Amino acid sequence: MTIFQDKVKALRAHHEELLSRKNKPVEWGNGIYEKYKNPILTAEHTPLEWRYDFDEKSNPYLMQRIMMNATLNSGAIKWNGKYLLVVRVEGADRKSFFAVAESPNGVDNFRFWDEPITMPEDVVPATNIYDMRLTAHEDGYIYGVFCAERHDDAQPGDLSAATATAAIARTKDLVNWERLPDLKTMSQQRNVVLHPEFVDGKYAFYTRPQDGFIDTGSGGGIGWALVDDITHAEIKEEKIINARHYHTIQEVKNGEGPHPIKTDKGWLHLAHGVRGCASGLRYVLYMYMTSLEDPTKVIAEPGGYLLVPEGPEYIGDVMNVVFANGWIADEDGKVFIYYASSDTRMHVATSTIDRLVDYCMNTPKDDYRTQFSVEKIKALVAKNKQTLSK
């Protein structure tokens, strides 16, 4: 065996050790969910064949010819008994693409399929695509709604100027994708989610209207809109169902994460909220619930965040960020929340539908003033004194 072959053998052994590493819950949690000790996907989890040329003649130094930078913001679905993520993989060239990774148990042993997804182009090709939300719709298709980014040609002198539109594709097998025309909207959109059921015979979208590529501007929060024809989807009217508020976790902007989970108490929603701080923008996750009879009516919204970056999760390409656009609810009620930290790596947290409903229904809401927050704490202290004195 040559030195080159020895290096390849060692490389494959190291990679297999990473892929097969068992994951365990963090010992102490908050009772709402359990985080896990290890990230479930990193750039190093991507297949070696995507990165290395294993021909000794053309790559005698065994260099990475195509480097990967991050695995983040992944859609999720249970498919043929496996837990599948449609991962946003970002290369060293800053271009993102989609690739499927699957796990037998949802918390470890995630392995990518052999090749990335070949996503057909829209009429106007996109420079970058990312952050797919997966929805198994009652019409029989699995839809992927994702952001398509293009340069803003109205600002030719600004190489950072961009536009964001909601791209739509659908599939029956997660391999072959049919690209539909981008969603037509009255403003830029980069956080659009398809509701899993027809509403009044129409397709329903959660939206996030915004004035610019980054800034929401006059966009008031998470919106709701109905569309007649998914193959030529156009939003002509939308209403805000979950608004931004001053001095809250969603002061700067907010956006729907994955599609909501249907429960007998209402629709469970996972969203991200953004506020400004001295170090930049802080992204956290929060929850709310809407009515089964009227999905635009919020029936519960706990105050504050559900999940934030902790420890090593703070560190990465974009610091102090958690983002989720995928979760899976098992038949037994267990929920897998897939989230990215600092735009760098993927994690999982697990809970149950019962716990998440309890959290939403029984956690105090934000009343937007310090005085009311203190009153709630004092009320809980008094209740505990009475309970513990018995």
Per-region residue spans from a language model:
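Beta-rich carbohydrate-recognition and catalytic domains
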Residues: M1-N73, I77-T127, A136-V193, E197-V252, ...
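Short glycine-rich, acidic/polar surface loops and turns
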Residues: E310-Y314, V322-W327
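Well-ordered alpha/beta subsegment
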Residues: I328-G333
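Short, surface-exposed ligand- or partner-binding patches at beta-edge/loop junctions that are enriched
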Residues: F336
